[in-house]
């Protein structure tokens, strides 16, 4: 299938200037009834729960509000701020990392992965015929992969969870049927039990217990991880983090007791990258937190104008185990 592009709108001057500011917060105010806004939240709100008290949420003006009047603003960029204050995570992607990732993905270098993920999703036969269905993307980043999955599931809606407000600005616009909310995926998710038909996890932390809780009994978990061969030609020169050789074993341990593996598809193909592509690749990942941007650019430039590398991924499907007892 044709790969859906990530949201292509660039940050405004104001967004760049205020990249570190988190939009929205939880607060108490009198309840007001307002019609639900157009967009995905009218469909998604049934799945979401108040992160303060666990009660249901409803759309109220430009916010989500529970019966106890805990209120969560829908930022002007379209995402909902469920994390606030000290609960925000320190390792969320920066504005610069998000811009680099967007540029790299829009160049099409991971299009084979995006297409394979969409085909795998379509082959699952979920949701049941006649049902709209819900896809939860845990650690969604810019929503690039969620958009592809939603294209493969006409009528389904998607919820992108991520800790980075900069990424969420993109995720909220990645697809007309996608909503986005700020959240730390290591914490219990602010969604009800069994609400998801598919849980998507692409290059993101894995919370096996929460994946199982929010996934319906006939649902599926899709996990994408890099293999040890991924970008092997660039790791030393750019200072990229090595892929743990025991990553597959650790993945199985993380999901053990919650999921049974169904199948894994290996996807490997050559990459031809420009110096700008290599710079974006280095700047969009964890290395950007440890190496100065100028040094990353110098390392990328030293590799030459055209660079050959290997893209190598595992796409795994898991099914939820029945409850114990």
Language-model-derived ranges and their functions:
Residues 2-14, 25-91:
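N-terminal auxiliary segments of SAM/dcSAM-dependent transferases
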Residues 45-46, 265-325:
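Conserved Class I S-adenosyl-L-methionine
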Residues 90-116:
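Class I SAM-dependent methyltransferase Rossmann-like catalytic core
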Residues 134-137, 141-188:
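Class I SAM-dependent methyltransferase SAM/SAH-binding core
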Residues 187-198:
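A short acidic, Gly/Pro-enriched loop at the edge of an enzyme's catalytic core
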Residues 208-222:
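A short glycine-rich, Lys/Arg-flanked "PGG" loop and its adjoining helix->strand segment in the class I
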Residues 220-252:
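Conserved class I S-adenosyl-L-methionine
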Residues 244-258, 285-296:
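Short alpha-helix
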């Amino acid at each position: 299938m044709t790969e859906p592009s990530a949201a292509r709108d660039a940050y405004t001057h104001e967004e760049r200037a205020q990249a570190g500011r988190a939009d929205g917060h939880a607060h108490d105010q009198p309840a007001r009834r307002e019609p639900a806004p157009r967009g995905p939240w009218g469909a998604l709100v049934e799945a979401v729960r108040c992160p303060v008290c666990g009660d249901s949420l409803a759309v109220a003006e430009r916010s989500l509000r529970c019966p106890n009047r805990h209120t969560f603003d829908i930022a002007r960029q379209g995402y909902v701020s469920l994390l606030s204050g000290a609960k925000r995570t320190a390792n969320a992607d920066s504005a610069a990392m998000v811009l680099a990732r967007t540029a790299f993905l829009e160049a099409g270098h991971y299009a084979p992965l995006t297409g394979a993920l969409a085909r795998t999703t379509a082959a699952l036969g979920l949701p049941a015929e006649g049902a709209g269905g819900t896809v939860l993307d845990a650690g969604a980043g810019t929503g690039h992969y969620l958009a592809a999955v939603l294209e493969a599931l006409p009528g389904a809606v998607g919820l992108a969870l991520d800790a980075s407000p900069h990424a969420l600005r993109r995720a909220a616009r990645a697809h007309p049927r996608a909503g986005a909310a700020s959240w730390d995926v290591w914490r219990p998710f602010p969604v009800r039990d069994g609400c998801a038909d598919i849980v998507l996890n692409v290059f993101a932390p894995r919370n096996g217990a929460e994946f199982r809780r929010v996934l319906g009994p006939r649902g599926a978990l899709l996990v994408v991880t890099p293999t040890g061969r991924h970008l092997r030609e660039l790791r030393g020169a750019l200072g990229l983090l090595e892929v743990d050789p025991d990553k597959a074993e650790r993945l199985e341990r993380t999901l053990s007791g919650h999921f049974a593996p169904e199948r894994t598809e290996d996807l490997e193909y050559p990459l031809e990258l420009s110096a700008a592509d290599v710079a974006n690749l280095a700047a969009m990942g964890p290395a950007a937190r440890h190496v100065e941007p100028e040094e990353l650019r110098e390392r990328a430039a030293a590799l030459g104008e055209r660079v050959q590398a290997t893209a190598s991924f595992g796409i795994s499907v898991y099914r939820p185990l029945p409850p114990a007892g």
